[in-house]
């Protein structure tokens, strides 16, 4: 790139998600039919391997009020700890019946959101470490310039969580708990509750990615 002085290049200005984020990214939720196959919160098929779970929660602002116009994406490994990507070169067989990625919007009335997925397996970390089962999550909403990245861990994986290099990189142990979803069983279904707090007391840990 001879002749280029990258110090002279200005950063492209960012914008918030705005009030029309659903029209662009989840048109069906805005009652606009565009796609034959709409994106949704279901990551599993009939033949998907692994334990079915539902991940659900709300997003709260600094005053403790639920946000009702947020959009959430998740991506995760399959039950064997393999991401459905050609870049994952662990040598393990990827589950062809698992999407590994989903997008949903919060309910306009209550702010609740949920995903139907499977509990992921542990994945390799740096320098031979192992990352505990987790789901990566990003939030888009009005008033947020850049999407907020966080992770969802599971409270019934305490031993694996204690060894996770990302959780251990968080200085205060009490802050790590903001990334741990609480398990319950409801009508025979395994549900993990994960509430996200944008600001204030018990603010969720977000990552600079």
UniProtKB/Swiss-Prot annotation:
GO terms for MF: ferric iron binding; protocatechuate 3,4-dioxygenase activity
| Taxonomy of the source species | Bacteria, Pseudomonadati, Pseudomonadota, Gammaproteobacteria, Moraxellales
Note the subunit structure. The enzyme is an oligomer of 12 copies of the alpha and beta chains.
Q: Which cofactor does it need?
A: Fe(3+)
Organism per entry? Acinetobacter baylyi (strain ATCC 33305 / BD413 / ADP1)
Named in its record, the pathway it takes part in is: Aromatic compound metabolism; beta-ketoadipate pathway; 3-carboxy-cis,cis-muconate from 3,4-dihydroxybenzoate: step 1/1
| Protein residues bound to 3,4-dihydroxybenzoate | 142
Q: Does the keyword Oxidoreductase apply?
A: yes
What does it do? Answer: Plays an essential role in the utilization of numerous aromatic and hydroaromatic compounds via the beta-ketoadipate pathway.
Cofactor note text? Binds Fe(3+) ion per subunit.
Catalyzed reaction equations: 3,4-dihydroxybenzoate + O2 = 3-carboxy-cis,cis-muconate + 2 H(+)
PANTHER family assigned: DIOXYGENASE, PUTATIVE (AFU_ORTHOLOGUE AFUA_2G02910)-RELATED, PROTOCATECHUATE 3,4-DIOXYGENASE ALPHA CHAIN
Looking at the Swiss-Prot or TrEMBL record, what is one Pfam family this protein matches?
A: Dioxygenase_C
Q: Which NCBIfam families does the record match to this protein?
A: protocat_alph
Protein known as: Protocatechuate 3,4-dioxygenase alpha chain
The Enzyme Commission number assigned here is: 1.13.11.3
The keyword Magnesium belongs to this UniProt entry's keyword annotation: no
